[in-house]
Amino acid sequence: MENLAAKFNNNSNLFRTYTMTLKFNDRICGGIPKSEKAIEGWIRANVEDKSKLEQMISDTKESMNVDNLSEEDLNNLAKSAWNGFKSDENGIYIEGRQIKSMFKESANVIKNVLNVSAFKARVAERVFVDEDKVYILKPLLLPFEENDPDNKYKEPTGSYEGMVHAMTAMGKISALKRVDYVDNCHITFTLKVLDEKLVTKDKKRLDIPTYIMHLINHAQENGLGAERSQGNGKFTCEFFGEIETTEEN
């Protein structure tokens, strides 16, 4: 019996595949709470699928290395809100879904500029980031060293602290906020885009590179990551190119 799944999986006729490199102008900031209680509260407030809640809480705690914090770190956590990056044995990373959200956010903003109806929904259904983990990379010194294992940042390059203010039932409160960041860095990821042009309201047809770069031109000013209201996360698109695929019979 022929395995049809093997025959049609990764059908090269359905999607076009691109690679993209974004170089951050200054820094990218982490936005995931590092204290255990904060991790639980953050996930419970943001996860819609409650059936997966406990597993996600456990996985996030592990990837944030909360069990390996020093006594000094724990003392800092007790008196501050500390946001950082997820990490594994390869280095620190942002998630592919964050980049997907960036594209959707920009689509929602520029939909009227491009005269595309339901642009956010169209991007959500057509543009996919292939990687689950997008590692934060050091500056490239030589071409073609992207896969060098030493090219990934293992930890943030710094952190800064500031005051945050909020209104509660007990009145206005202030707390110390600590944010991890990486400067002098870039990311590279793979985009899979449905192979069709978008049709505007006035019947113009936008090819994939055109509408993707419109999204990027807005996103690079809006930023990626946390603390964007403070001017962090702005970037420049250093490379955007199609990966040629060979069709198999």
PLM region descriptions:
Residues 1-249:
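RNA-interacting cores
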